[in-house]
Structures are given as structure tokens and as C-alpha cells.
Amino acid sequence: PLYSSAASDVYKRQLLLLIISFGCSPVFAENRAMKDMCNRLFPEHSGNFTFELAPDSLENDFFTIESINDKIKISGNNNNSLATGLNHYLKYYCHTHVSWYATDKIEMPRQLPVLLDKITIFAKCKTRFFLNYCTFGYSMPYWKWKDWERLIDWMALNGVNTPLAITGQEAIWYDVWKEMGLKDQEIRSYFTGPAHLPWHRMSNVDYWQSPLPLSWLKNQRKLQKQIVDRERLLGMTPVLPAFSGHVPAELKRLYPDAAITQMSQWGGYDEKYRSHFIDPMDPLFGKIQKRYLEKQTKLYGTDHIYGIDPFNEVDSPNWDEDFLRTVSDKIFHSIEQVDSLAHWIQMLSLIHI
């Protein structure tokens, strides 16, 4: 479990101070985000729960659960903790399972169990990451908002606070490449079909089952806005993509002096589906990064954490340690030039097929 009831003495003393401070504070306003979640999951019992945000002064996330006046009261230091507390009650007291499938019915007891004593649970770790690039290529390409809404609820219920959020990036890349001189058909043909986009994003394959429809790009852009807004509302920090060096082959025509090379073949795909990479030491790299991140931030906002994997299951143009070190340095510097608070998260699936 991501949360533990074994609080340290320091935590217990801090919690006592918080409880004392609650007695001197005004009544907290109803937590709309959590009420809305209850209405989505089990509307018939929504009125049986109350949620209260506690001062966020402890080192770790925490929640408390208690029965007060025939209601279940859940307190926590943020909405993510409140959601995790709700799931703890559902799982261990109601014996209720909430799946991430929107069509799965949630079976609740007719009478909600009463807690005899108040319980307090502390998170075991601060950052609780979920998803990887490949998961966005199974059924997710065809998900509607209703599907995502349920998954985001599930993530919050299970304590996830750092989800990968890479939907909708092609809409931004479309604008970037078009501004740099590529034609509509070139750009949409450079993308793969929806089911293979994760491997396109990881620089494994281009052009496969393309062109990508403009309508799909627009719908995914709107969907990503809904996704990151809801994730933030529920106390999460979405991990957005940034530029890794993967470029369309056609960019070489417009920028003949750019240090663009072809990546190795991947997964048995024909030569014509190989991807291309621009050296991060080329000045054009930083310009592309800046253009992309500024557009992404304007559209989706930022929490200053970005996912980049430059050589996922493909060969680096050069395996020299100094080259790889310089590539990493230049990639991070290009992000930092746009976002001085940037953090880089990497999956490290650095194996060659």
C-alpha cells in the first residue's frame, strides 16, 4: 500500500497541533471536487460523506476517517489524500471495489459501516507515479471523456499524484511543424495512426497507418485539456511531454544544414518507417523545444515536470559516454531555458530490439 497507519512520533505531535487548530478555525466550505466524485461513483450515498481539507503542514500526505452524526467524515491535506481516504473506507469497511472501467457498476452496502474509532493514515512516499508511454496505445486512443473521467477518479482513489499526461500532443506538434514550413499532408503523414502513436512519440516508428485525421487532432487537444484540468483538481501533477529530438524527415529539406540523422530500425518495420533525430547540440533543437513548450504551456498549463526518453529501444547516433552526457545536458538546458523550474522524468526503457 502507498499509505501506512504507522505514523512517527513527530507526525503524531504535528497531527495533534492540527487537531487543536481545527477547534479554533471556522467551518470549512464543502469540498465540491470530492462531492462531485461521490455523485459520479455512488450518487445514492453521496450525502453520507463529508470532506474537509486540513492544513498542509505535515511532511507526508495523510488522511483521517471518522464517523460523526451518521456521516463518514474524511479529512486530508489535499484532494488526492481525501480521495485516497475515501477509497480506504470503501475497500476496507464497505468491501467495495472501484474499477477504472466507466461501465463497471459499483456495489455499495445498503447501510454504510460506522467507524468506532478515528483512523489516521500517512503516505509512504511523496511522489506516486502512474502510466507509461505504451499504455496510451492500447484502448486509450479511442477513449472518450467518460472513460478518462473514471480512470482519473480511480487514480485519485488509489493515491496516484503524478500521472503521465501525453494525450493531445500531436495537435501542438502539428502547429509547430507547420510554422516551420512543413505542409499539412507531410505532417499528418509523419504521425502514425492512433494505435501506434506511443511508439511514434518514443521515436520508434513514423508514417505507419497514416495520415492522422485533422478531426482526431482537434478532438484529442480538447480531451487533453479536460484530462489535465481534472487531474489538477484532484491534487495531481500531470507529467507533460517535451521535445526529445524526434523530427520529421522532411525537415531536412527546409533546414539542409541541420544535424539530422536517421535512427536505427525498430521492431521489424521496413526501412521507410525509420524515424529521424536532430542533434541537441544543433541550435535548431533549442528553437524547436522553445516553440513546443510555449505552445503546450499556453494550451495545457504546466506543473514543471516533463517526460522525455530520447533513445527508447533504438540506437543512439553515438554511444560515446561524452556524447550521451552532452545530449542529456543539452536536452535539459533546452527545457530550462523555457521553464526555469523544470524537472525531467525518464522511463529508461533503453533496450534495443
PLM region descriptions:
Residues V98-S99:
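Conserved short beta-strand edge segments in small beta-sheet-based binding/regulatory domains
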Residues H45, A54-E59, T64, I68-N80, ...:
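Aromatic-lined carbohydrate-binding surfaces of glycoside hydrolases
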Residues F28-P43:
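Short N-terminal segments immediately surrounding and downstream of signal-peptide cleavage
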Residues Q111-L116:
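Long, charged amphipathic helices and adjacent flexible linkers at domain junctions
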Residues S8-E30:
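Bacterial Sec-dependent N-terminal signal peptides
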Residues P1-Y11, I351-H352:
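Single conserved hydrophobic/aromatic residue that forms the stacking wall/gate
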